[in-house]
Swiss-Prot record:
Mg(2+) binds at residue 83. Binds 1 Mg(2+) ion per subunit. Its cofactor is Mg(2+). This is dITP/XTP pyrophosphatase. The lineage of its organism: Bacteria, Pseudomonadati, Pseudomonadota, Alphaproteobacteria, Sphingomonadales. Gene3D superfamilies: 3.90.950.10. It comes from Zymomonas mobilis subsp. mobilis (strain ATCC 31821 / ZM4 / CP4).
């Protein structure tokens, strides 16, 4: 897969249609909010009726690139993919790239959070509750050029989960320096500190500003 290194000149994203390579409504909402100041015309892979490709990469970046390449090839437009997940220190960084799969089909993140809690409980009371979210972004052009970015946010897991303003594992994650979970702090506060926001800051600085 093509990797873009910091020493190479970044390709700018020109005005026009940008296809968001996602079927996850929570992600789509956050991505559109982050892109809203730039006047891009966005449409999702779900809205275009595109299937989801098999994500068989061994990293967040690899899976984001698989999705972005698939959509760029199918649509002939620039595509942006997000692959993200929760990495728990005491679980050897699981669920990691399998974060969505832990939620099963159809996606049930209450079940996924319960599984994380059960796995940690099995480790014993001394198990670390440290965890971090990762967000990998892959921006792919129809000619195959790719720009990749990755953001992180560190914190601790809580149980029981709290809040109903997020999605995924948000209700069980409290970022360092905060007392509320990602599902309690609200969209604007989350946007200021999240892994997705960090990855987007890199993308915007490199390809849009």
């Amino acid at each position: 897969m093509t990797q873009t290194h910091s020493s190479e000149k970044r390709r700018r994203l020109e005005p026009g249609r940008l296809v968001l390579a996602s079927h996850n409504q929570g992600k789509l909402r956050e991505i559109r909010e982050l892109l809203s100041p730039f006047g891009l015309e966005t449409v999702s892979a779900a809205e275009l009726g595109l299937p989801e490709p098999v994500e068989d990469g061994n990293s967040f970046i690899a899976n984001a690139e698989i999705k972005a390449r698939f959509v760029a090839e199918k649509t002939g437009s620039v595509a942006l993919a997000d692959d993200s997940g929760l990495c728990v220190e005491a679980l050897d960084e699981a669920p990691g790239i399998y974060s969505a799969r832990w939620a099963g089909e159809p996606r049930d993140f209450d079940k996924a959070m319960e599984k994380v809690h059960q796995e940690l409980t099995a480790k014993g009371a001394e198990a670390s509750k440290r965890a971090h979210f990762v967000c990998a972004l892959s921006l792919c052009w129809p000619d195959g050029h790719v720009e990749n970015f990755e953001g992180h946010v560190w914190g601790n897991l809580i149980w029981p989960p709290r809040g109903d303003r997020g999605f995924g594992y948000d209700p069980m994650f409290v970022a360092d320096g905060h007392q509320q979970s990602f599902a309690e702090i609200g969209a604007e506060a989350k946007k200021a500190i999240s892994h997705r926001s960090e990855a987007f800051k890199q993308l915007l600085a490199a390809c849009l500003r």
